[in-house]
Structures are given as C-alpha cells and as structure tokens.
C-alpha cells in the first residue's frame, strides 16, 4: 500500500476493474441459489457443530455427576462395611484376646521375683501390641476395602454408570461369585482368619519386644517421651521399602492378601461339574495383582501414612489428657490469668507418670478407640488423598472428553 500511486489508475485499468466487478455481479445473480445454498449449508454446519458440542458437554457433565454420585455412595457403603467388619471380629469375636495380657492383680500376688519380672514384661508387651494392632487394623482395613470396592466398580459398574444403559450393565467383566470372593465383608474377611491374624499379631509383638527392652515398668514416662517411643516403633513398620513391599517379611500389608496358592484353593473348593472355575481363578488373580501394584505405588504409600497418622493422632490426643495435671493448671491460672490483658486458655501442664500406672490407662484408651472406631474410619475416608486415589482406581484415570456418548 505504501507504493500505491493515483496515476496507476489509467482509464484502461479502471475500465477493466469495472468489467470484472460487473462479471462478478452477474455471476452472483445467475448463481444466487447456489450461493444461498453454500451459505446456508455453512450456517447449518456451524449450528450443528455448536449443538453437538453443547450436547456432548452436557453429556460429559451428566456422566461426571453420575460417576461422582456412584463414587460417593460406595465410599459411604465402604465406611459402614468396615465398621461392621471390625465390630464383628474385634468386639464380638474378641479376636484381640489372642494377645494374652496378665492382670495387675496376678503380678502383685506373684511371689517369685523371676516370674513377676516375666509377667510385667508380658504386660507391657501385650498392651502395646494391642495398641499397635488396633491403630493399624482400622486404617489398613479401611483403605483395603475401599480399593476392593472401587476395583469391582471399575470392572462391573462403571460402564453402566457412564452410559446409564442396562445393556452395558449386563456386560460385567467379573461375575457375582468372584466379586463375593474378592471383597472383604463381615462374613468373609481373609485378614481376620485365625492363622493369618495370628501371624499379623506375632509380627507386631516380636518387634515391640525389642523396642520395649529398655522401657521398664517401674520407671516414669513423660508424654513427649512416650510419643518418641511410639515413633521409634512405627519406624520399624512404616518405611516404604518395608510396608509397601508385600514380599518383605516385615510388611503388614501382606496379611491382607491371599497367596496365589490360597486363591487356587478357594476357587477349587467352589468347583462344580458345570463350571471348572478357570476364569474365576484368573479374574481373582488379576484383581489381587492390581492390588499388589497399587500397594507399591507412591500414591498408595502417601495415603497409607496419612491414614495411619489419623489413627495414631486420635489415640495421642486422648492420651494427652491422662498426662494433664488439673491441680497444676489451677495454680498456674491463679498466677497468670489475672495479669493477662485478654481472656485465653492456657494448656494444662503435663506431668510424668509411672509406667505401671500408664499401662492400664493405655489399655483403657484402646477400648475407647474400638468404641469410637467409626469416627476414625470417617476421618480417614474424608481425606483428599484417599478419595483421589480411589477415584483414580474406579475411573482408571478416564478422560471424559474421549467417551463416546
């Protein structure tokens, strides 16, 4: 445009431009229907594209809502089932009674010094073993049941939820018998089988014997000192290379999952002439292999650590009250509070406690944890970490934009 000159518009050139415009006008006039149809078709195509995209966005939004509704309802179902499982095996079946605990009365009445020492050692080991067993059982069973339910959801129900189509629902990849064998319930819980649970208890107990070797029953403990003891014991179980590797002899998670031989025995016991159960065996094996792979992931380890922390936090919060001194609190309040410019609450000071007094208080707290287990299960289930992991398991990290509606 910078080099444009008016003198370039000679009469001949102006005439040529005029003739070209006239021809173009004639073309539009002679082909007005075609031009109209092309314009109309383009408009229809654009409108159709917008409508279909809008429809797809709506379908995606509805599908996401259906999946989320299904997910939230099944997580609540899992919470209720875990509560029922633990209630049955710990409250009703008294499975923790496998950990024999001598009474204080029997210790006091024992005359033989060596026997008395043996009983006191057994007392401290058994109570701390019970404590760790309960504080590990609640998060482990909670997380494991969630994984089971969401794996079954992925293979059996997700398509139906996505498409809301009964035909899709009937094409489940895993049958009801396999689902029943796979998911732990109050009537079928592999973890709480006698031999299995006894091995779980023994693993904890042996480590606690070592950790409590220098923790004498006639000594005193502070609240902070006891917390350090708990942390030291936990470190023996909760390092990633130990707990997340079920091939490790010290992994607590391996007691949640049957071995391949045990899966085979289970399937063989249900074999009938009409069904040789080979497919069920392969499906069960596939599901448990997925669980093993999840166990070894960093995401799962983060969820497990966070869930165990929730469990121990509930215990230590309540135990702290046993170390609080009301009398010292009154003395401090009478000195400090009158001089404060605003009202505030001073934390109660903590005292030390003889371990022989502390142990029965811990035993009582174990009972309180079992009674209030539902609260711990709900706290674990409400964390972002566990919900993100399980939503990922259910949907297999599905890209909703690629779903064909």
Swiss-Prot record:
Name of the protein this chain belongs to: Peroxisome biogenesis factor 3
Topology with respect to the bilayer: Multi-pass membrane protein
Protein's organism: Dictyostelium discoideum
Subcellular location: Peroxisome membrane
Functional note: Involved in peroxisome biosynthesis.
Hydrolase found in the keyword field: no
Upper lineage: Eukaryota, Amoebozoa, Evosea, Eumycetozoa, Dictyostelia
Keyword Membrane found: yes
Domain of life: Eukaryota
């Amino acid at each position: 445009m910078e080099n444009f000159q008016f003198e370039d518009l000679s009469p001949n050139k102006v005439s040529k431009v005029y003739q070209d415009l006239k021809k173009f006008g004639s073309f539009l006039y002679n082909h007005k229907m075609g031009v109209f149809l092309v314009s109309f078709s383009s408009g229809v195509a654009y409108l159709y594209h917008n409508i279909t995209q809008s429809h797809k966005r709506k379908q995606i939004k509805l599908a996401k809502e259906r999946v989320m509704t299904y997910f939230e309802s099944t997580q609540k179902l899992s919470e209720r089932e875990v509560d029922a499982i633990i209630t049955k095996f710990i409250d009703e079946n008294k499975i923790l009674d496998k950990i024999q605990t001598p009474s204080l009365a029997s210790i006091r009445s024992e005359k033989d010094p060596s026997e008395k020492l043996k009983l006191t050692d057994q007392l401290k080991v058994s109570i701390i073993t019970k404590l760790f067993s309960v504080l590990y059982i609640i998060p482990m069973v909670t997380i494991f049941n969630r994984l089971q339910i969401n794996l079954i959801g992925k293979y059996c129900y997700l398509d139906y939820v996505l498409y809301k189509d009964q035909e899709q629902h009937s094409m489940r990849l895993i049958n009801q018998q396999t689902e029943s064998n796979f998911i732990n319930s109050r009537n079928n819980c592999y973890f709480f089988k006698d031999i299995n649970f006894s091995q779980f208890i023994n693993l904890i107990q042996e480590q606690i014997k070592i950790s409590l070797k220098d923790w004498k029953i006639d000594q005193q403990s502070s609240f902070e000192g006891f917390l350090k003891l708990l942390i030291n014991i936990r470190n023996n179980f909760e390092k990633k290379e130990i707990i997340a590797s079920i091939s490790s002899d010290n992994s607590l998670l391996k007691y949640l999952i049957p071995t391949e031989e045990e899966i085979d025995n289970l399937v063989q016991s249900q074999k009938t002439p009409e069904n040789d159960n080979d497919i069920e065996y392969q499906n069960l094996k596939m599901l448990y292999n997925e669980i093993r792979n999840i166990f070894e992931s960093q995401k799962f380890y983060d969820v497990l650590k966070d869930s165990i922390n929730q469990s121990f936090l509930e215990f230590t919060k309540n135990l702290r009250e046993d170390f609080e001194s009301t009398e010292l609190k009154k003395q401090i309040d009478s000195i400090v509070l009158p001089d404060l410019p605003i009202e505030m609450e001073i934390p109660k000071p903590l005292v030390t406690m003889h371990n022989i007094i502390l142990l029965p208080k811990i035993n009582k707290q174990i009972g309180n944890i079992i009674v209030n287990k539902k609260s711990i299960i709900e706290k674990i289930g409400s964390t972002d970490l566990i919900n993100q992991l399980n939503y990922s398991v259910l949907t297999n990290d599905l890209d909703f934009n690629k779903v064909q509606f």
